[in-house]
């Protein structure tokens, strides 16, 4: 895990960062992602949808430095070389969830196998964060598979100055012979503008459409 320091005085985003950081401005955007081909391919290959979506999300995040920009435990501004997903897993018996992290991997099969191993070991632990220690370079991903939504927002008391993206996925639904899934993206305006939110959604849709290239 390498954290690269950003020298604020020389950063071309300095004015924007200081303005929105002082205001602590965050925002959310939700988009319906077409997963028609993706869902069919995942089913044919015998994979689960949730980890496959997590993999696709992390491909977009790790491709773009802006989504890896944050503040570390030493209160330094910078960006990580790579982020790992910290995702929720629901326990039907307790009706609570755990948060498990898995090492990111550019190879889908390797990531999927690591996910399955982590799931097997930690999913039944009655702790909120059973896999410890949790590295700093993680981003929160969750799924609410019981409901589709058109918007979703998290209200966070941002005393820790959390700048990284937060992604929430909803229940997939059918419309006009297509299958869609809502994806909510929460960003901090200090590091990400509307352009970057659009970049994430467009690249995520693209990698979902090109599932044949990586599965």
From Swiss-Prot:
Gene3D superfamilies: Chloramphenicol acetyltransferase-like domain (3.30.559.10). Homotrimer. It comes from Staphylococcus aureus. It comes from the Bacteria. This enzyme is an effector of chloramphenicol resistance in bacteria. The keyword Electron transport does not apply. This is Chloramphenicol acetyltransferase. InterPro entries: CAT-like_dom_sf, Chloramphenicol_AcTrfase_AS, Cmp_AcTrfase. SMART domains: CAT. Pfam families: CAT (PF00302). GO terms for molecular function: chloramphenicol O-acetyltransferase activity. Belongs to the chloramphenicol acetyltransferase family. GO terms for biological process: response to antibiotic. PROSITE patterns: CAT. Its EC number is 2.3.1.28. Keywords: Acyltransferase, Antibiotic resistance, Plasmid, Transferase. The active site is at 189 (proton acceptor). It catalyses: chloramphenicol + acetyl-CoA = chloramphenicol 3-acetate + CoA. It is an enzyme of class 2 (transferase). PANTHER family: CHLORAMPHENICOL ACETYLTRANSFERASE, SLR0299 PROTEIN.
